[in-house]
Structure formats: structure tokens, C-alpha cells
Amino acid sequence: MPLLQIAEPGQSSAPHQHRIAIGIDLGTTHSLAATVLSGKPKVLNDVQNRRLLPSIVHYGDNTTHYGEEAKPFIIADPKNTIVSVKRFMGRSKADIKFQHPYELVGSEKNEMPAFETRAGRKTPVEISAEILKQLKDRAEDSLQNPVNGAVITVPAYFDEAQRQATRYAAQLAGLNILRLLNEPTAAAVAYGLDQESNLATDRNYVIYDLGGGTFDVSILRFSQGVFEVLATGGHTALGGDDLDRLIVKWAKKQLNIDVLSDEDYAVFIVAARQAKEQLSTQDSVELKLLEATLTLDRPTFESIIQVALDKTISVCKRVLRDAKLELTDIQNVVLVGGSTRSYAVQKAVREVFAQEPLCTINPDEVVAIGASITANQLIGNSQDGSLLLDVTPLSLGLETMGGLVERLISRNTAIPVARRQEFTTYQDGQTAMLIHVVQGERDLVEHCRSLGRFVLHGIPPMTAGQARIEVTFQVDADGLLTVSAREATSGVQAHIDIKPSYGLSEADTERLLIEGFQHAEEDKNLRHLKETKVEAERELEALEQALKVDADLLDEKQLEALNSAKESLKAQLEGSDIQAIEQAVQQLKVHSDAFAALRMNRHIDHALKGTKLDDWSKSN
């Protein structure tokens, strides 16, 4: 759906003017850019006719090297050669658990870490910006025109912090970012799944993305011009590198080797990778390992990696359940990522989905191609009417009394989206409210991830439960969250843009999802207990306030019975027997309802005192 642009009077651009927009795949291993020329997507080469830019930056004494030129320094100068910077985006120093050769500076929690390099301290955002700047320069050199806008792809599991870090990097690189696009969505666009001739009915697609280090799967639906991501899932420690390691493990067993030196391990890994690639077109290959030679055929290779393939299929089935679809509901399966070149991978997908997967576009380039098509559409060059809707990877909500989570936006909700809900005060005279925003699938705040807090001040003093605070969650097309709160009577309001200083790793995101599934029943029971306790505490609080004012209405026996019921409820609140708490609440209400009737009579008497019957009749 092209965006309408409004120009200043007398400054409208010519109707035929083509604006330059590019799609960028900012990858962990390599990055690339593409654009649409004469209606067709084209991957942009550098001056040496290379399409892929290795995502590597080396900081020397007086110069900086990028891509292929930086590669030799990985061994020669590892501390000043940054590779796989994407893994550091949106994380704190404490989040970075994996092994790396770098000297990181920064506090353990809230501060963005930086790499200590010969050129000074460099943050992941700055390094990513340098890679993006290389791609921007490549595009402008190739097209001989300035770039007007860019669509940058991100993994479906990137959270708000990681997406925001990507936006900052684009801004530092001088790019006008049109939007961030989930990588699987970009792949679907590249294959033109929204352009198929038979679109009278809804069509569902699986995007199976097996890269070097991670696996992602998405289910998309195209319906009446709208391209919607129904569900996403993945495995953060599963990719082509893991297939290579499985081959190495097999080879070690064949050769009766327990431990390999670092140098020998490198030889085994290279041989395993070559064998894996050759088996895509050959029935068998030879692995030359040290002074031995092993033969590996397709059936053996398939049995070696079956455990990894089973994991990917398990994720596919889970995402199908999330989307409430059966295997027979899927019209096409798209293969993305270099690891899907493997014959064994293609065979596994073919057998599970009972259809031939789409793999005609270079899997290393398909994401950038899809991003370029979307960029061309958003910049206004294309009249294509399809609309892309990504989804939220985790649920978003806020904390309520008792440490419970009230979800406003559920996971796998299409974005952009806004949700609004009313809340109220807990105590009499409450003039401020803390809004605590959380992310996750559990029912208790302590089991979810805190995204941020802000306070709404200036609430007019009222009786508990009378104030009306309207809270709005709004997620934009890039997956970035804004939360606002407004008190209805006074109009006071406050808001927060969720830009955490550090984010979730993909593994953390996956862990939160799995824990949500595993603890669903436990959380349901715990939530019931917490809600019961909150309601009981509210009854006790209201009773305490009433006794301060009108305790004289009760005789000694009534007061003793009420206090006894009150203490009994307090005792039950120390435990976790829901039925016992509910019974204690009901017993308290037997006595407190009689007390409430006495209070009501007193207040009516006060209201009518000194009022003539005729005056009262006239007023009614």
C-alpha cells in the first residue's frame, strides 16, 4: 500500500520521478543490499562485483577495514576485529554469556556495552552503523543516486530493545529507515506469494529459515490484499554450524578420537562443511581428515543430522498449533537460509509437508530481495496493494495488585496495533499510580521481563475504585512500544516509549515462551490464589476504614464477632488454600454486611436531618 506524500505548494515532484529505496539484510555472518530496477529486484554488487559483505569490521592504527578486507585480521588481530556484532545488539554486558575474544566495557546491567578497540570504544550500534554505511555507499555508487529510504530486516524474535538498536544504527549510517521487517516476511515477499493468480481464497504459507546459527519459522496468511504473520517460532541454537558439528562428532567416533586440538578441529569443521554442501548434489563424498579418509553417503548423513531436523519439524508443528492450522492448510513452504541447500533438509521438509518446497531464489539473497520490494512499495514507486503485518513475539501487559500481569496485547498479535483498557485506584485518596510494563507469557510479574516503569501523578483524591485511568499500549510497524496513561476526570496523562537499554537474547525469548507453556496450569492456579487474596485484602482494607469511623454502631458482641471473622481471614491469607480463604471472606461478609446496613442507615439519617418532608418530596 503506497504512502501518499504531501509536498509544499510549488514543490511537488514529477509524477514519473523514481525514488531510490533499498532493502538491507543486516546479517550475523554477512550483509547485503538490493533494490528494484525496472520493476525487478536486483542485489547490488561492490566495485569488485561481490554481492555479500561479511559482517566484519577491523579497527587498525589509522584505518578501518570492512568485509573481505577485514577477514585476515580475525586471526591476526582478534581483539580489534569485530565479527557477528548482531549477537551483541540490544544486550547488556551481563546478557552476553557466549565466548568471545573482546574486551567489553560497561556496567553489568543497564549500560550499553562497548568494545575496547585500537580506535577507541565502539558500541554494537556504532559498529552496525559502519556496516550499514558500507551498504549505503555501495548502493549510491552502483545507482549513481542518493538513497531516499531503506527497509532493514531483523529476526522475528528481536524484541523492542534490539529493534530500537537497529533503528539507531540506521540513523547513524545516515539512512532514512522506512520500516523494520521480519526476515521471514521478507522472504515471502521475495517469492511473490501475494501475487499468485488464485487469490480468491485465503492462502497460508510456511517460511522455513535455517541459517548458520539459528532456526526460525513463520506462518503467513494472504487474504484480501493483506499479508499477515499468523505465528512465529524458532530455535536459537540450531543451524548449519550445528549440522557441521554433528558430522565432526560422527567422524571422531569413526576414527576413535576423543579430543581434537583447536587446529585439528578447524580442519574437521571445514571438511564437514564441504561434505554437507557436496551432498546437496552428490550421493556420497570423501572427507580427508588428518591422515585418514572417510566416506559419507546421503543416508548416513541424514541419520547423523536427524536429531537436528526433528527439532526444526517440532518447532514447525508448534507454530502450526499457535496459528490453529493443520498441515493440509498450508499452500506453500519457502526455504530460506544457506543451510536449506542441503538435500537432507529439503527432503525432510518435503516429507513433512507433503509438497515440494520453494527454493529457486538464492537463500542467501532472498531476504534482501524481499526487503527491496517492500522498500520500493513504501517509497511510493510501486502500486502493489498488499499490506504486510508482522506480529509481536511475546505478550505485553502491566502489573496489577498482587504482582499479577494483566495482558493488553497477546503474543502473535498482528502489528501495528493499539489496545486500551481501564484501571482504577486501590486506596482511598490515591493521587498517583505506578504503571509497570512487562513482557512475557507467565501470570506473575516476577516471572516476566520488566520493560519499564512510569508514574501517573495528579489523580484527584477519590474513594478507592472511583478513579478511571485509561491505559493504552501501542506497537508501531517496527515493533516499538509506547504506553500512555490518562485519568478521565482531570485529563492528566503520562507516557513512556519502551527503549530499554538492553534487550532479550533470542534464547531468552524462546525460554519465556517455553516456560509459559510448561507452567500454564500452575500459573492459572497461582493467579486464582493471588486474585482471591487481593479481593480479601480489599475487603479487610474497606472494613478497617469503616471501623475507624463507625465502630460505635456495634455493641460489644457484634464487634467481637466481626473482629474474630477479620482475624480468621488474616490467618487464612498466610496460607494458600483458596477454598479456605473464600470461606473466610464469606464469613466476614455475614458480619460486615450487617455493619454496612447500620452505616447506611446512619448516613441516611444524617442526610435527612433538618430536612422537611415537603422539601424532600419536592426535590423528588
Curated annotation (Swiss-Prot):
UniProt keyword annotation of Nucleotide-binding present: yes
Family annotation (InterPro entries): ATPase_NBD (IPR043129), Heat_shock_70_CS (IPR018181), HscA_NBD (IPR042039), HSP70_C_sf (IPR029048), HSP70_peptide-bd_sf (IPR029047), Hsp_70_fam (IPR013126), ISC_FeS_clus_asmbl_HscA (IPR010236)
Matching Pfam families: HSP70 (PF00012)
BP term (GO), one: iron-sulfur cluster assembly
UniProt keyword list: ATP-binding, Chaperone, Nucleotide-binding, Stress response
Listed GO MF terms: ATP binding; ATP hydrolysis activity; ATP-dependent protein folding chaperone; unfolded protein binding
Source organism superkingdom: Bacteria
Keyword check for Nucleotide-binding: yes
Similarity comment: family membership: Belongs to the heat shock protein 70 family.
Known role: Chaperone involved in the maturation of iron-sulfur cluster-containing proteins. Has a low intrinsic ATPase activity which is markedly stimulated by HscB.
Annotated PANTHER family: HEAT SHOCK PROTEIN 70KDA
Name listed for the protein in its UniProt record: Chaperone protein HscA homolog
Species: Acinetobacter baumannii (strain SDF)
Lineage: Bacteria, Pseudomonadati, Pseudomonadota, Gammaproteobacteria, Moraxellales
Gene: hscA
